[in-house]
Amino acid sequence: MIRHLPNAISVLRGLSVVPLAVLLALDAYAYAFFVALLAGLSDLLDGWLAKRFGWVTPAGAWLDPIADKLFVVVCFAMLALNGLAPHWLLWLIIARDAILLLGSLAWHWFLAPLEVQPRRLGKLTTFLEVLTLLVVLANAANWDVALVYVQIGIALVALATVASSIDYVWHWAYKAHRKKWSPSE
């Protein structure tokens, strides 16, 4: 039972979007900061537990990125609705996730069952998204966070989102090309 702890943590992170969205809707940015911080730390914790104790499961390989995407998209949607993040950034994040989803479905339907394989640039993008979310929330809570840090975070998230999209498409297109033209098939 304890070997499923990382999966439970991922599920809780996904569910954390409900109180987080409510807090953001109420402009309770300080409270939202701490909920987001816990959710961000839970992403590190579930991955560490799974790898450290060998509790990696096929379900966890799917739950973790789904929880991450749900968390990031809901948070940036609420930030955009509250005027704290640009709408174009939300749409860029959604476009990246749509590309990943469609690519995953295409791979699964046309080539082979898909094994979730996070890329380093994808992990960096998620880290920057969570960090930027925390910086935006700290700024909105009127803590001593300069607006320039918010702007830098938004720029870094945008760059990482585009770069990781290109990286995923390039990587999986190359794998698909090799698989399609492999002499063994």
Model-identified regions with their sequence ranges:
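Alpha-helical transmembrane bundles and membrane-interface segments of multipass inner-membrane proteins
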Residues: 1-185
